[in-house]
Amino acid sequence: MSTAYFDADCDLEPSLKSLFSLKTLKWIFVGGKGGVGKTTTSCSIASRLAEERESVLILSTDPAHNLSDAFVQKFSNAPTLVNGYKNLYAMELDASYQQAVEFKLKEENSLFSKFLPDLISALPGIDEALGFATLMQSVKSMSYSVIVFDTAPTGHTLRLLSFPSLLEKGLSKLFSIKQNMSGALQLINSVSGNAIEEETLNSKLEDLKAITTSVKETFQDPSKTTFVCVCIPEFLSVYETERLIQELAKQSISCSHIVVNQVMFPIDLPSGNDQGESVLKDSSELLKLEDIPSDHSKLVEFTEKIVCSYNKLLSYSKLLYSKYYSKRNMQMKYLEQIRDLYSYDFHVAYIPTLNNEVSKIRVLIS
């Protein structure tokens, strides 16, 4: 494939206009492999949304929180207004918050409370899934126009997305176990004298089921929820992106936007083997006439130094351009794959490699 496809500005426009035009969206998840710029992308999307929506919350579910670093401001479990904004809030979830929103089964002073935790723990992963579902129910009740989720790397995110399905299966087993234990519960009631009301158990399980259904329905509603995949044009990142997209499809979660970060755009240089020479072809203009010695012997020495410096700089320039084009050619292969895989069914935004490190978030995606 010709590199001309990627040289056209119109094909590499860093735009997610179609995402920002979806006014009904409530949850926007941003995810991908570690180190591809998820937090920068999340913050940029949230910043852009703050220009159009009444209120925006960006929420980090990644244990290695970076929102505070991105905005150069400390955030916590509580939504905090981001400096410089009137309607953009940020929060970073940690273990204490997740524990606080979980069902407090052990705090109930009833014999019933001694059984359900054991039933739940008998199903691998369901306790964590319950905590997540309750957390999402809490987030759902927040009165923000839209919430942007800055998620953990792909593996953690895939586990997170599988929780609703895991809960459905787990709760079905719990209902089955409850039915099988009905006789034992009646026996315990008669021996202990403490009434374990079956209605209480039913109510608790129905509450869990209702939360699971609510979260799953919101996840699978493309008018309310979407997922933005972030990657870079390298093998592992493109591979994980495809794995993530396939898993999202299995979970019936909308995903129609991909952000490709760190793209090395072409620079205006002559073609051929004289790229290094072209950089320095006018280097003689840098010399001031008054610096040139008039003495013949000194002039020879001066000229030798100039030639030596020129050759060193030329070699260094060739090395830099060699590294640039090697990296560029490697990216071209994966940019081609991204185009072939996603250009027809996805909105793909290509973000150029920045000259400087991102320390304060600005809108990178329009």
Curated annotation (Swiss-Prot):
Q: What is its main location?
A: cytoplasm
For this protein, the Enzyme Commission number is 3.6.-.-
Q: Which residues bind ATP?
A: 33-40, 234, 261
- GO cellular component labels: GET complex
Principal EC category: hydrolase
Active-site feature positions: 62
Mind listing the UniProt keywords for this protein, alphabetically?
ATP-binding, Cytoplasm, Endoplasmic reticulum, Hydrolase, Nucleotide-binding, Transport
Note the Pfam families from the entry.
Answer: ArsA_ATPase (PF02374)
One BP term from GO = tail-anchored membrane protein insertion into ER membrane
- Which one of the record's GO molecular function terms can you name? ATP binding
Q: Where in the cell is it found?
A: Cytoplasm; Endoplasmic reticulum
Recorded superkingdom: Eukaryota
The UniProt similarity line reads: Belongs to the arsA ATPase family.
Q: What does this protein do?
A: ATPase required for the post-translational delivery of tail-anchored (TA) proteins to the endoplasmic reticulum. Recognizes and selectively binds the transmembrane domain of TA proteins in the cytosol. This complex then targets to the endoplasmic reticulum by membrane-bound receptors, where the tail-anchored protein is released for insertion. This process is regulated by ATP binding and hydrolysis. ATP binding drives the homodimer towards the closed dimer state, facilitating recognition of newly synthesized TA membrane proteins. ATP hydrolysis is required for insertion.
Query: What quaternary structure, including any partners, is listed in this protein's UniProt entry?
Result: Homodimer.
Protein name as annotated: ATPase ASNA1 homolog
